[in-house]
């Protein structure tokens, strides 16, 4: 994992997304994302394919999402903003808690994700 641009907090707190996060993810995300580097960008594309969508609006782009479990402990979701500055091998994870504090994470730490495929369309 690595530090990001600090933009996640801004976008997550926009009402156009926040209301849908509550409805579709079942939680109110902590304002910020955990950026997870994945060695193979093709893995990211496979996870992203068929992911449900959170509609943007008012100049904000759509966001695809997949529910996941981080380190076997924290339920959250991987977000795939259709407008992003991140390279393809980076996942953005959100959860209802501050993940760095809750899991005592630092840049360079390795994390695991268990993907919930129940909402992915084939």
Curated annotation (Swiss-Prot):
Pfam families: CTP-dep_RFKase. Mg(2+) binds at residues 33, 35. It is an enzyme of class 2 (transferase). It catalyses: riboflavin + CTP = CDP + FMN + H(+). InterPro entries: RibK_CTP-dep, Riboflavin_kinase_archaeal, Riboflavin_kinase_CTP-dep, Riboflavin_kinase_dom_sf. CDP binds at residues 4-9, 97-100. Its EC number is 2.7.1.161. Binds 1 Mg(2+) ion per subunit. FMN binds at residues 84, 92. Pathway: Cofactor biosynthesis; FMN biosynthesis; FMN from riboflavin (CTP route): step 1/1. GO terms for molecular function: magnesium ion binding; nucleotide binding; riboflavin kinase activity. GO terms for biological process: FMN biosynthetic process; riboflavin biosynthetic process. Its cofactor is Mg(2+). Gene3D superfamilies: Riboflavin kinase-like. It comes from the Archaea. Keywords: Flavoprotein, FMN, Kinase, Magnesium, Metal-binding, Nucleotide-binding, Transferase. Catalyzes the CTP-dependent phosphorylation of riboflavin (vitamin B2) to form flavin mononucleotide (FMN). Belongs to the archaeal riboflavin kinase family. This is Riboflavin kinase. It comes from Methanothermobacter thermautotrophicus (strain ATCC 29096 / DSM 1053 / JCM 10044 / NBRC 100330 / Delta H). The lineage of its organism: Archaea, Methanobacteriati, Methanobacteriota, Methanomada group, Methanobacteria.
């Amino acid at each position: 994992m690595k530090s990001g641009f600090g933009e996640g907090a801004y976008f997550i707190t926009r009402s156009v997304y926040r209301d849908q996060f509550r409805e579709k993810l079942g939680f109110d995300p902590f304002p910020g994302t955990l950026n997870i580097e994945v060695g193979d960008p093709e893995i990211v594309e496979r996870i992203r394919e068929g992911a449900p969508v959170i509609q943007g609006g008012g100049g904000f782009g759509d966001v695809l999402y997949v529910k996941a479990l981080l380190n076997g402990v924290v339920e959250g979701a991987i977000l795939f903003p259709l407008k992003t500055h991140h390279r393809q091998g980076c996942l953005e994870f959100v959860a209802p808690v501050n993940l760095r504090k809750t899991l005592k994470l630092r840049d360079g730490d390795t994390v695991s994700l268990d993907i919930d495929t129940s909402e992915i369309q084939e």
